[in-house]
């Protein structure tokens, strides 16, 4: 087993007890909730006449089902309105901080918590959402949980978990111009596989990771789950501390000094023992695009969709399904594939830096004819900053739709959906069958810059041609 890694240290600090059967009871420092996975958990508490154990350690917002075209209340979608009302009532009853629409701080939970300074090094963080691993970018141990575990955390502030193994993914060198964090993480998942991380925490490290901004690091950790890992994390450094400083919920004055001293001690030791170490040469990563029905089915922009015989027996089975569903042929080039819809947003790539990069690509250009393109800021704070910088106008002038914050077409639990077998270029995190709202809808995952380039050209295009 691993030893003296950041994961081991944070786990041991939060371990309450060892349980029969080999699992541990782990204290959760921060519990994030939203409108979709919390109602049943609150209902279970009510049935047992229980209260939330530590309301101050729970924070709520709305993101999954909220409309992004019109957020006037009541919503047109009765279910969405009902779910928001339920969360509002539960937060009032249990005295939980709630960042609702119009508060200035509402948005996708994994965008909101970091930008408010709620996410901090050394924490254990849980949320009823798969992409909670995002917060590991700050040196926290963060993982998604199911509704029954949401109930457990609300009631006890703890959950039962088996300790994970730790795989270090050492990323050598640096990314080339026009290659982004999204490309790197898609490349990693392709090389290791979508099941390689099962039972593991991923520690992302090395010169390529160190060179990334905090928002780029969040993109990397966000998609850990797509590689099978329960969580992913990065050792905190000066970039981490600078990002958190002066945020709304960050420590202040002498509390800051005390927190900073502790945070600086939180890192894997130089002689840490890992269960596995994998090396990736970041300088060889190209702009990367998925072609199939899992995030692991991707190719560089100048590569071709793999032939069946080039794949392992296990991968061949899924590849056959992907060829048929996506309408691609083995050996086909992904470049120049015509696109129907372009979506920039999500907890993976809906932050201000993502919008800046995409706006730079589309400035003074026009969206290709017959392309539906839209931008969904990850939070109200992101939307406000984008408007101050004039990014919304750049997108609107180019022919994009500018929406209100929410998860939007990432999971299409709202009104943003593909139609028929439309093909989308998406900056989100999952390309599963039907993920974006239509049973036959198809998704190509890529960086926001690549989505922007696809919107302008009407097809999958090498972003480096726009530079």
Curated annotation (Swiss-Prot):
Binds 1 [4Fe-4S] cluster per subunit. Pathway: Amino-acid biosynthesis; L-leucine biosynthesis; L-leucine from 3-methyl-2-oxobutanoate: step 2/4. Its EC number is 4.2.1.33. GO terms for molecular function: 3-isopropylmalate dehydratase activity; 4 iron, 4 sulfur cluster binding; metal ion binding. Its cofactor is [4Fe-4S] cluster. It holds the Pfam family Aconitase. It comes from the Bacteria. Keywords: 4Fe-4S, Amino-acid biosynthesis, Branched-chain amino acid biosynthesis, Iron, Iron-sulfur, Leucine biosynthesis, Lyase, Metal-binding. Signal peptide: none annotated. Heterodimer of LeuC and LeuD. Catalyzes the isomerization between 2-isopropylmalate and 3-isopropylmalate, via the formation of 2-isopropylmaleate. This is 3-isopropylmalate dehydratase large subunit. It comes from Prochlorococcus marinus (strain MIT 9301). The gene is leuC.
